[in-house]
Structure formats: C-alpha cells, structure tokens
C-alpha cells in the first residue's frame, strides 16, 4: 500500500530546506574557501550560484512540489532503471558525506563541553589535547592514521543517537519541529557574534585580508572548481533532500521565491560566519604581535576549531566568564547547523528505503544509521582529518556536479522532456517566469559550465593518484567511487538481486509456498 505524505507548513518547509542547506558546508566550508582564496572567491561563487546552483534548486523544488514524490520514486517512474540508478546516486553520495560530516558535528559537541570548563582558557585545548592530530597533510598508509580517539568516537556515536531520535518523528513531527527551533536560533547567534567580533581590536586586519581581491586569482581553475562545489554543497542540491521536503510542502507553492530565499539565507550565513572567523583571526594575530594572518592558522576542516577557542580564551583574559558564555552560544549554534544538515543527508536515504523499497521507517532508519555510523569510525582516529579531502573532492566537486549535469540534460528535449511541463507549473505559481532566455541558461550555459568543472575535479583527482597520494588512491577510490557505485547498483537492482539469490539457493517465496 502506498504511504500517504502529510504536509508541512510553508515556514516549516523553508526552514527545513535552509537547515539542510546551511549546515557545516556554509559555516565551516565557506570560511575555509575564503581563507584560501580571499575576496576573489566571491566572484565565481556568486556566478555559479546564480547560473547553475539556483536553477538546479528551482527544478528540484518544482519536481517535488508538483509530483508529490521523492527523487527515487519520481526518476524511477520517468526513467526506468536508468532513472532509478540516477536517483539512488543522490542518496548514496550524501549518505557517504554523512559519515565524516557526523564526526565534525561530534567535534562541536566536545567543544560545547569544553566551553563550560577552564580548559577553554588554554585556547588550543581541543586541537592539541582532544584531536591530538600529528599529521594534517597527507598520510602514507593506514598505520599513519594514528590511534583511535575514543572521545571523538563517543561524541560521534552521540550525534548518531540524537539524529535517530529526531528522524524517528519523520518529516512532519521530527524534522519540521527541530528546524523551527534550530534555524532561527542559528541566525540570531551568527548575527550577534558577527557584530560583537567586529568590535574587537585587530578585527580590521582580518577583514582587510578577507575582502582582498587579487585579479590574477580569477585565472586559477582551482578557484572556480572550489566555488562550483561550494555553491552546490551550500544549497543542498543534488542530494535528494530538496525533492523530499518539497513533496511534503503545501501544493502549488512559489518554488522560485523559496529558492531565492534559501540561496540568500545560506549565503548570508556563510558570509557572516566568515566575518566572525576573519575578525577572530585578526584579533588573535594582533594579540600575538603578527601582521600576516597566514602565520597564525592553517586552512582545513579544523580551521574554525583552531580559531574560535583561541578567540574566546583572549576574551576571557579581558572579561572573565564572558568567553565561556560566547563559546557556549557559538558551538551550540554550530551544533544546530550541523545537525540540521545531517538530518537532510540521512533522510535522503531513509525516505528512499521507506517509500520505494517499502521498509518500515524504523527499519529504514536503523539500516541507514548503523551503516553510516560504522563507516564513520574510520574518521575518528587522531589523523583522520587528513582523509577528508579524498572524499570531499568526490562528494562536493564531482558527484554533486555530475548529478546536477544529468538533471539539466535529463529535463531537456534530449532526455525525459520535462522542461515544458515544469515551466508551465512554475509560471502558474511563481512571480518569476521561465522565459526563452532562461531556458538557454538552464539547458545550455549551466550544463557546459558544470561539465567543465567536473572535468577539472576529475583531472585533479587523477593527478593526485599519479603522484601516489595515499588518501586519493585508497579512500577516494574505495569509498568515494567504489562504495557509492556499489550501493547505487544494489539499491537500483535490489529486486533482481533478491530474485536471483532465491533462485540460486532455491529459496521459495511466500507465494510459492502457498
């Protein structure tokens, strides 16, 4: 029997999508990219956001809202086995992302606890005493991973347990209610901290570097590759999540307006968080008597976890306890952001198993959580952060772009021929009409730009393998490519595999047993 979907409110839909989108991709990823490329990053980021990422968001929202189906149900129906494979690729890619994303959320949980103690005054306590990372670059073999970090492991398990409790309530009772609390709190805290850190002595030094624009950097292909990956990642497109939430949203809503609100909101959070980080780096650099902020920290997934605790330690030296209070607020905010995004990532798989393979929600949730949690153990060793790049390049810079490219080609006259139907639905309900010019952008310009960046990402990956980079050659290939494709194949052909298994071992079905 087909399961009936319950609607969520317009506000619930908007906050759920924004929660899935903003996450740690905006709060951790965006400041890191700005730290690497400075002000030059904003130009390709905005170009990609407007020409490629937002149009994909339009389409995903429109499909989910019009057809009231998740990505797997819809593409399996219009595209057969090829469509099913394409749709499951969304879920397997994003569930892989959740395996190391959950560890980062676990880091925030530990920092919340540290913020209640005097260890915050040590500044780098988490980075040196908890994370205990001895190699933040490349690792040559699995032995280089170091020791299993039990505190990180327990925090990660805690994150999965909290996530399971929220997801048990489903889209309506669990996800919508959680995001109605988390997202407004997130916005409020980010705005307060951005204003406060701007008043710190030395903040101007950081902001000058943040908005420094080197025109030559725009000729760097790596800049454009990073910008494209970041824009898709920050909007949560190509993960399946948008279809799911849109299918539960009120019918005939203005998807174009909602997409612009989400894009503006997530970009605003990313920029405000970056201002907080650069204000903090400037203040720390001045406190250390340094004029070049590059001498203070190294870029990477742990950037915020290096910067923010040191800032609050400095504040505590000036105004006792204030640093602890601000640290608690910041890391609770970061935890909410991470959880809201992690919810969407795992729901993409759970929803597919529930509605397409017809498992009970508890069964689908148990399979998804236990499987992802088992893989996440790999990222709880002392030097595991060095593994992140091997997966991140496939998730954010290759798979998400491949899915976006196939979607844009798929709705064209050369694929499933959906563009005119979606255009009619949008134009009936939206203030912004899909014109002939917009059709050229969606079906020609955007796919070409995305394809160029896919090629750049794959080229970089191959170069790293040629250079014998262990992370790319092992974790990147086995998890980023092998595991994703294997899971996608199994989920696409699960009925055929089940039938073949029964025939091979001569197992009779209930019907055959009478």
Can you name each region flagged by the protein language model?
Residues 1-28, 56-61, 65-78, 84-88, ...:
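Membrane-interface "cap" regions at the ends of multi-pass membrane proteins
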Residues 2-7, 11, 176, 180-343, ...:
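Membrane-embedded translocation segments of transport machinery
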Residues 4-5, 33-36, 71-89, 103-172, ...:
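Inter-helical loop and helix-membrane interface segments of multi-pass membrane transporters/permeases
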Residues 9-46, 205, 241-249, 258-260, ...:
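Transmembrane helix-boundary motif of multi-pass solute transporters/channels
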Residues 24-39, 163-174, 195-208, 216-221, ...:
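Transmembrane helix-loop junctions in multi-pass membrane proteins
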Residues 34-59, 151, 400, 477-486:
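Extracellular loop-to-transmembrane helix junctions
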Residues 56, 101-128, 187-211, 279, ...:
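Hydrophobic alpha-helical segments and their helix-loop junctions in multi-pass secondary transporters
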Residues 89-93, 357-369, 394, 398-477, ...:
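C-terminal membrane-solvent junction of multi-pass transporters and transport-like membrane proteins
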């Amino acid at each position: 029997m087909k399961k009936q979907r319950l609607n969520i409110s317009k506000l619930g839909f908007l906050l759920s999508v924004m929660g899935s989108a903003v996450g740690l991709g905006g709060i951790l990823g965006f400041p890191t990219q700005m730290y690497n490329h400075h002000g030059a990053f904003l130009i390709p980021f905005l170009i990609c956001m407007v020409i490629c990422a937002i149009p994909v968001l339009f389409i995903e929202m429109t499909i989910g809202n019009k057809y009231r189906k998740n990505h797997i149900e819809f593409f399996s129906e219009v595209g057969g086995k090829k469509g099913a494979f394409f749709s499951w690729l969304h879920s397997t890619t994003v569930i892989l992302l959740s395996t190391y994303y959950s560890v980062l959320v676990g880091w925030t949980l530990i920092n919340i606890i540290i913020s209640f103690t005097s260890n915050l005054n040590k500044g780098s306590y988490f980075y040196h005493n908890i994370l205990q990372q001895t190699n933040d670059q490349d690792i040559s073999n699995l032995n280089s991973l170091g020791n299993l970090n039990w505190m990180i492991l327990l925090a990660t398990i805690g994150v999965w347990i909290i996530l399971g409790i929220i997801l048990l309530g489903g889209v309506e009772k669990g996800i919508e209610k959680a995001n109605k609390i988390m997202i407004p709190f997130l916005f409020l805290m980010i705005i307060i901290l951005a204003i406060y850190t701007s008043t710190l002595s030395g903040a101007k030094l950081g902001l000058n570097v943040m908005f420094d624009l080197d025109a030559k950097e725009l000729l760097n292909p790596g800049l454009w590759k990073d910008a494209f990956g970041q824009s898709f990642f920050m909007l949560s497109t190509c993960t399946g999540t948008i279809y799911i939430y849109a299918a539960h949203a009120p019918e005939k809503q203005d998807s174009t307006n909602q997409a612009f609100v989400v894009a503006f909101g997530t970009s605003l959070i990313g920029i405000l968080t970056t201002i907080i980080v650069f204000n903090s780096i400037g203040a720390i650099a001045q406190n250390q008597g340094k004029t070049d902020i590059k001498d203070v920290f190294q870029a990477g997934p742990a950037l915020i976890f290096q910067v923010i605790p040191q800032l609050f330690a400095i504040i505590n030296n000036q105004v006792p306890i204030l640093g602890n209070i601000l640290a608690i607020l910041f890391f609770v905010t970061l935890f909410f952001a991470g959880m809201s995004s992690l919810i969407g990532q795992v729901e993409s798989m759970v929803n597919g198993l529930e509605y397409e393979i017809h498992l009970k929600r508890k069964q689908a949730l148990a399979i998804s959580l236990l499987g992802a949690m088992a893989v996440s153990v790999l990222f709880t060793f002392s030097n595991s952060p060095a593994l992140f790049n091997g997966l991140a390049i496939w998730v954010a810079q290759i798979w998400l772009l491949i899915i976006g490219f196939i979607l844009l080609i798929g709705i064209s006259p050369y694929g499933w021929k959906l563009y005119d139907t979606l255009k009619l639905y949008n134009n009936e309900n939206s203030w912004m009409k899909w014109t002939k010019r917009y059709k050229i952008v969606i079906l020609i310009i955007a796919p070409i730009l995305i394809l160029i960046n896919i090629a750049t990402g794959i080229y970089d990956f191959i170069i790293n393998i040629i250079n014998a980079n262990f992370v790319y050659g092992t974790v990147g290939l086995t998890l980023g490519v092998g595991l994703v494709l294997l899971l996608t194949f199994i989920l696409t052909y699960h009925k055929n595999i089940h039938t073949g298994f029964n025939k091979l071992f001569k197992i009779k079905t209930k019907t055959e047993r009478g």
